Structures are given as structure tokens and as C-alpha cells.
Amino acid sequence: MSQTAYRTHHATEVTEALVGQKVTLAGWVDRRRDHGGVAFIDLRDSTGLVQVVIYDEDMARPLRSEFVIQITGEVRLRPDGNENTHLATGKIEVVAETIEILAKSDALPFQVSTALENESENKLPGEDVRLKYRYLDLRRPSMQHNLKLRSDMAKAARHALEDMDFTEVETPTFIKSTPEGARDFVVPARLVPGSWYALPQSPQLLKQLLMVSGVERYYQLARCYRDEDFRADRQPEFTQLDMEMAYVDQEDVMAMTEKVIAAIWKSAGYEVQLPLPRITWKDAMDKYGSDKPDLRFGNPLVELTEYFKNTPFRVFQAPYVGAVVFKGGAATPRRQFDAWQDWARQRGAKGLAYVVFGENGELKGPVAKNLSDEERNGLREAVGAEEGDAVFFAAGSRESAQLLLGAVRVELASREGLLDPKKFAFTWVVDFPLFKPTDDPDDDDVAVGHSKWTSMHHPFTMPSKDWIDKFDKDPEHAMSDSYDIVCNGEEMGGGSVRIHRDDIQARVLDVLGITKEEADEKFGFLLEAFKYGAPPHAGLALGWDRTVSILAGADSIRDVIAFPKAGGGRDPLTGAPAPISDEQRAETGVDYDPDADEN
């Protein structure tokens, strides 16, 4: 790193090669230790720590945690036995000759010392406090690492895409409101009272226009905005690595994306074996109870619908019955099985049926007595369980029961310590339905259109070749040319082949219950562009916050965003959202009433 007015070196640049030389350093006082008239300061900057030795008590006396200081001194080897093998600079120290306090610090609301990094996270305050003082929270080395990792990943992605002849293009932030599956954030247009801009949920339509414009390979790290109910894994504003290509099909996009992912992971020291595995959407739901399956461990779901087709147990007289094995679960106390019932109810289920296989194959548990002798005798073999195991069941509609069992599968793996954050299990999920029911209780997306069907991905997704001529005759079974990339049970991104023919687009909109007049009003500009020769095109977007959090092994995407929002979209740091003044309301026209002008 280059020398500046305040330093000759960064902390971790001070090595054995500089022993006997004078250096000037600048940074924060990470912590201070006093030993018999000698003070030791850990000086911290963005690169790490270096130990400073101060023999002058008057020089050391005013120094406190998080004071910003500049020190000049000579580098020397630490005395034998005093090396710190955990530090990059653990073999040397700097003997201070001069120290200047550049800025003082008040008492901290919480400690950010590197010395606490390897201790329990319980040392940290609640997340609201961390977010209120985010500038302090970001001083912690783990947070600095995440921000640096995010930057390095972006650099690797850019290099990979530019090597494949992609062009980075910035698309507008103020656009017209268009249907994309969530609520828009809107901004008043001061110069056009009563009119509003929308912040883009994605650059979807704009990047399609770029394909029509002749930009055959486009990308950007795009800021996106969605006004949806807050969930732990969502942010109202987020970033995605957006990519689109002309004259390509699904295979081309998937191959390109794999190269980008491999380059990103390589930048962090990991090798990704290509090509990545694939699974169909149906198989993912049937085997893992999720359209974003975690493949770091096995234990697939077992369908028992046929097995229980003549069951006397009314709960299992359902369209779907499935199970997941709880290895060694027979030793689980009854109170823990009761806690599983609460866990299931928190997810909207009525409960979680179970049996246990005791010694000598004896079947126990609340469900056992409700089964026929034939069902009890063959159950262990049917589910692949062993003596000492337990089995959880779910029955009901196929999707809701599978989703519950999929959540059980992951929760069991978590409790068994099988979710290694340093192991990365990628898979493509392909062959998605084109549409989904509008009234799906397990879906929180905003329906696009006014019919019983809404888009599984978005209204501009191309039907698969086998369905182009008939998707509007059988929307329930129609399939699409779409694909998601999944890692460790998280959806990293998704994409599709886009509709480039206005006749197909019109039929899709008709299935969604969007009239021609409504389509022209909301995105007529795209339909108009298609009339002038739109090339076949396809693309994909990676959720950047999610992708970084997976590679960082972070518990939350908020740990890889510099200034994230808390629950409900609140910003404890700045106090946003906040009321605006009466003057601002009048100036921006948020209360504009067109009827008042007529009167």
C-alpha cells in the first residue's frame, strides 16, 4: 500500500524485514495493557494489528480504547517466548518514540476490540444497538473481512464477465411502476403533480430493452427495491448481479453463470467443480421438500401416499403423506417431541406426527396406535429407518406437507451439526412450472394480473418448447424455460429464457388476466420495442447479498451489507423512515388532489 501523510506502512506490512527501521503508523487503540511501567498498545487499522511498546508513562497515560493515534518508532523482534503466532505481525513490535492523538473517543456503547473477536458472540449487544452504532460495529475485523470479501467478489465477477465480452450498463433508478411480483416503492414527481416514479424491483424490462438495442451481453451490479413484508432473509433495498445475453438459450446462460460462480469462489480460495449438478423442480420438492434444496447432507423425504392408501388413520387419508427419518430419535425425551409440535405450529402446521422404533423394532408414539397391523409391520422398511430411529410425518396437500417435511429435514441437520458453512453444495433447479395459483397460502408474492394464475417467476418468462403451443389451454401443467441456482439451501439467483415474440407475450398476459389496455399502460414500451425485431435472449440475476453471505459463512445477509435495515425496514442509524415537513409535503405534491383542481 502507498505511503500517505499519516503513515509509512499499514499494520500488517510491518514484518521482520523492517527490523531496525523507523516506521510511522496510524490507527485505533484496540486495547492497552500495562506491565510494570511499560505500556503495550495493540494498534489496529484496516489490515490488522501490530503491537506498540511505550516506555514513557507520560506518553502512554492519556491513551484509551478507540483513540485514533499516529505513532513513530523503531521495529524490533519480540523477546523470545513473547511471539504471538495468531498475528501476522506476531514476531515483531514497534517501540514508540512519538505518539500523536489524532482523535479521542467517548466511552463506547459496546466493545469492538479484536481481542473479543474469538470470544462468544454473546459479548455483542442486540442487533438494534449494533445497527444504531454501525460505524463501530463495522470496525470489528469480521465485519471488515466481509466488506473486503464483497469487494473482491465483485472484482472477480466483473473480470469474468468482461473476459466473456460483457458490457456493464447502468439502468435508471426512477422508472414506471411495472408488475414484478412485489410492491413498488414510489417517489413523487414534483414537476408533474399527481404522478409518481417507481424504484425498480429489478432491471428486468430495461435489460430486455438493451437486448433489443443491440447490447448483446449486458451486466451490472444493480440496486433493487421491493416493498414487501419484512422477513429475516430479505432487505427492502438490495443488490443483484444482473446478466443478460442475446442469441442464447438456457444452456448458454447456465454455462456462463457457472464460469462466473467459479471465478467468484476462486477469488476466496475455493475451487468449484464444473459443470454443476442439476435437479428438476419436481424432484427437488419430492426429495427435499424445497425448491432450493440443501445438498450438504442426505436424508431425503419418503413419500408414503400409496403406502397409506387404505389406512384407518383419518389424518393420513390425505392427497399426500410423506415422512423424514430422525436418526437416533428414539432416545429423544417426550418433552422435546412436544417442542417439535410447537415448532411445526409456528410454521402454520397443526402439528407434527411421529413414531419411534424402539428396541426389538417395537413401534411407539402417538401415531402408532392409529395404524393397522400391516402398516405397523412394514413401516420401518418403507421409510428406510433403523432400530433407535424416529420418523416424522406430514399429510395434506402435496406442496404444504412437503414444505413442512423439508423444513424438518434441515432443522434435523442443523441440530446434528451437518450444516458446514465451509462446504458449498451447488445445484441448478430446472423445469419450473410457468404459472402458480394466485391463492397459494404458502406464497407471499403479490399476484401479477387478475386471474387464478400468476407467474412462477415473472410475466416475461418463455414457456418451454413443448408448451409454446398449448400453455394457455392448460396453465396448471405448463412448464417454463427457467432455472434457479442454489447453494446450501439458499437461492443464489434465478433466470429464464425471455419472451421475445409479441404474440406469445400477449397469450401469457391473457392467462394472467392482464388486459391489452392494462398491458399497454404498464409496459407498453416493451411491447412496442418487440415490434421492431427483438432477438432471442435470456439471462439470470444473482442475489448479491445472499451470494456474499454464503461465501462469508455469515448467519445473516445483514452481516455482509454495510448499512442494512432492521425489522420493518427501519434504519436505527439514521432514523429512517421518518416524517417529512409540511413544506416538503406541499413541495413534492404527495397530497395532490386532482379533483381539487377541477373545483
From Swiss-Prot:
The UniProt record lists the keyword Transcription: no
PROSITE patterns: AA_TRNA_LIGASE_II
CDD domains attached to this UniProt entry: AspRS_core (cd00777), EcAspRS_like_N (cd04317)
Residues with site note (Important for tRNA non-discrimination): H35, G81
Residues that, per the record, bind L-aspartate: E180, R226, H457, R498
GO CC terms, sorted: cytoplasm
Region (Aspartate) residue spans: 204-207
Catalytic reaction annotation: tRNA(Asx) + L-aspartate + ATP = L-aspartyl-tRNA(Asx) + AMP + diphosphate
Biased composition (Acidic residues): 590-599
EC numbers for this chain: 6.1.1.23
Domain of life: Bacteria
Principal location listed in the UniProt entry: cytoplasm
GO molecular function, one term: aspartate-tRNA(Asn) ligase activity
Gene Ontology biological-process annotations: aspartyl-tRNA aminoacylation
InterPro entries (UniProt xref): Aa-tRNA-synt_II, aa-tRNA-synth_II, aa-tRNA-synth_II/BPL/LPL, Asp-tRNA-ligase_1, Asp-tRNA-ligase_1_N, Asp/Asn-tRNA-synth_IIb, AspRS_core, GAD-like_sf
Keywords recorded for this protein, A-Z: Aminoacyl-tRNA synthetase, ATP-binding, Cytoplasm, Ligase, Nucleotide-binding, Protein biosynthesis
Residues where ATP binds: R226, D227, E228, Q235, E491, G543, W544, D545, R546
Annotated spans, Disordered: 565-599
Subcellular location: Cytoplasm
Similarity remark: Belongs to the class-II aminoacyl-tRNA synthetase family. Type 1 subfamily.
Function, as annotated: Aspartyl-tRNA synthetase with relaxed tRNA specificity since it is able to aspartylate not only its cognate tRNA(Asp) but also tRNA(Asn). Reaction proceeds in two steps: L-aspartate is first activated by ATP to form Asp-AMP and then transferred to the acceptor end of tRNA(Asp/Asn).
Assembly with partners or alone: Homodimer.
Protein name: Aspartate--tRNA(Asp/Asn) ligase
